[in-house]
């Protein structure tokens, strides 16, 4: 009997050890899950930081490109200035060469004059007055020549000075080209000061050159006054233009300062809002830390929090308002990517992050320039629209309609693909949410099963205790003599054995109940344990040796199983039931995988998406039909144009045919006239031969006359005159025929040339129309992109505000629910 009890006790201790190990493994699994969640959160934060770093790098590269563009423009401007100075120096060199030639000629004249004067000194008849006049006339060229040589020296010195200044400017420009793009502000200011000083030196040199040139022109060339006045007028105009540009620059700087002040105010407002958001986040975190855990917070705490706004990330499909596709068609059709990274406009977020810089001002100026170009295009179209014929306008309209229909077709296809993508995305999000619900329900069911198993085990022990107590009471009644004969020894032995078995069963049940109480004290935290018998969780999970010694000492414990222990066991059963009920409350309602959710708030969204998809398909078909109709119209217009060209060719061929017929008729009439003249000549010869009676019979016998008889009868002069007249008429007719043929050829050539010119003109107009359409579309795209970006920024701000308000409302609702709920020992997932 003792061996059986020991074996049973060993089995109970091994079962207890296995349960303790399973509890330790469950706690370790929970730690692993928590560590995995932390790892995923750190990975998300790392991805967010990488995105921010990439964005910062993109902004840095954009600023570097803008800085390079500014440097290139300034370099080109200074190179143009240097080129102008080179041209001025070349002109001055030419003038200096001309002055040198004039001085050489004057020196030659002076030498000739001196030779003449030396010859005149030998003459005795010359008086002193003529000598004085000659001396004065000699002194004037000497002074003039000395002044010219001095001016030449000054010009050469000035030329060397200008060459030195220009070499310095070129060195500055080359050094600016070779300098790196990452210059500091002090170095940039230093370069600007050097360039300004160089430009001042250059202006001073130009002024000195102009002054010397004016002096030279006034002293030596009086006819250069007009040129000097013209240059002075041009210089005055340039100075006025410079003053106007300086005033414009000052106004732009004032506007820039105002914009900087506005941006500073916006930054202060942004910093204030950020501080307020941080304060709200800290308050929420403090409220979350102080508030007790509840199963009602399970669904809200498992959702990720947006690090920028601190809101709970919810599904956008459940909060969005459905919009009909007909009302949303223009908005969807405008979604396009940016043209290029270099032409990317400056956004509002960049202005708020980096402040107002030169790139922003250049971008605004570029936008104004684009707008001015568009206005010029429309003004040109308006001013030159009357010169285009109706056929060209019709052709342009047909081509524009065809292109617009093609664009609308592509837009409708893009809308359909966008809606399909959104639908697939919503389905994927719904499936992921459904998978999360299934996982949550599986975890809850696993916990409920564990609680149910513990309850069943406790009920089995209570049943064993009740049965042992019942058998013990029955044995005591038998021992007391209730229901048995008084003198039966075998009955007494049976009663003693029954009492012994009842005591053993009672002892075994009490030991099992004590072990279960110890395990429940370790797992449930000893909320209902009695002092002296409670065991903490870390004591139950410390080591295997400790658990084995605890179980062995508990079996030999002198304390008996009291009613208080039984009540504790019943309290644990009630606690397990409460925990199981709390876990069941956390289970979510599941929908089918293959159908849409039937909730009231999501169903209208599904209907709106279905309507949007149907509308997008119908719009695509409509745009395809419009495109086909536009193409058919274009083909019909081309066929009509070919028909008109063929009709023109046919009319020209008919005119040629009429001309050829007239020519043939004229030739026929000429031939008939010649025949009539010959007949008249023959009749005149026959009437002259009627006087001879002897030849009448011969004439009657031979009706035709021979050539010899004709020569004998007609005079040679008449025949010669007729032949000359016939030859003259034939020449005239040939000349007229040649004139008609040449005129016809000229007409055909001119018509062909006009046709080619009209075709070329049509092609030029087509190209101009395509260029105008492309420019208009580009400007329209830019304007639409700007509007879209502003709308997106505004919607982002509104959504951020709404999400913050919604997050605060959710937090308030959760806190109110936690405060209103009674404080019980509830278990959260």
From Swiss-Prot:
InterPro entries named among the record's database cross-references: USBP1-like, USHBP1_PDZ-bd
GO cellular component, as recorded: cytoplasm; cytosol; lamellipodium; nucleoplasm; nucleus; plasma membrane
One GO process term, biological-process aspect: negative regulation of canonical Wnt signaling pathway
Reported function: Candidate for the putative colorectal tumor suppressor gene located at 5q21. Suppresses cell proliferation and the Wnt/b-catenin pathway in colorectal cancer cells. Inhibits DNA binding of b-catenin/TCF/LEF transcription factors. Involved in cell migration independently of RAC1, CDC42 and p21-activated kinase (PAK) activation.
Stated family: Belongs to the MCC family.
Renumbered ranges of motif PDZ-binding: 826-829
Outcome following mutation: residue 828 to A: Reduced binding to SCRIB
Positions with biased composition (Basic and acidic residues): 123-132, 689-698
Modified residues (Phosphoserine): 828
Effect of residue 267 to L: In a colorectal cancer sample
Region (Disordered) location: 114-139, 282-320, 672-700
Record keywords, A-Z: Cell membrane, Cell projection, Cytoplasm, Membrane, Nucleus, Phosphoprotein, Tumor suppressor, Wnt signaling pathway
Extent of motif Nuclear localization signal: 766-782
Primary localisation category: membrane
Tissue and organ expression note: Expressed in a variety of tissues.
Protein name: Colorectal mutant cancer protein
Compartment(s) of residence: Cell membrane; Cell projection, Lamellipodium; Nucleus; Cytoplasm
Biased composition (Polar residues): 285-312
Domain of life from the UniProt record: Eukaryota
Phenotypic consequence of residue 490 to L: In a colorectal cancer sample
